[in-house]
Amino acid sequence: MKPDLTGTRVVLRTIGPQDAADLFEIYGNPLTMEFASDPCFTSPTMVAQLMASVVRLEQTGESLEWAIVERKGNKVIGTCGLHSFSEAGHSCEVGCLLNAAYWRRGFMSEALGLLFAHATTLGVTCLTADIDADNVRSIALFEKLGFKAHAERYQRMLPFV
């Protein structure tokens, strides 16, 4: 079981059934989903499918996914995770999504800092982010966090300091 990761303003914790409404608010928002690899959700059924997929991928070791919870209101404001692990487990991709209502307030920077620190405990030494070329906000965030453009993707070596 993966641990909860606690920061100053956010907690990363396992996604659960109680999060369905907050997740639909995130994944059903066209602005939030503009550059996401998944289509914008149109029904709560799609959230249930997402949650089932998260459980299945975690059970097979293919992915680790957390809900990003704002501590102040105990609301799920996003998700982040690690996936596409290399054979040796030393590299993987990082993915994240934040409710547009919480953009540009430092929540994702804090969440990713917690995630990257945890990744080092798993033996991960290289993270990759696959970011759409038009997603200037995400590019700026990942560059701020030390990622460098590399073959149309962004990479960062760990540890994260």
Predicted region positions:
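Short loop/turn motifs at secondary-structure junctions and domain boundaries
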Residues: R56-G61
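Short, P/G- and charge-enriched loop/turn segments at secondary-structure junctions
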Residues: M1, S53-V55
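Conserved GNAT-fold acetyl-CoA-binding loop/helix
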Residues: L31-S53, L64
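Acyl-donor (CoA/ACP) binding surface of acyl/acetyltransferases
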Residues: M1-E34, E65-V161
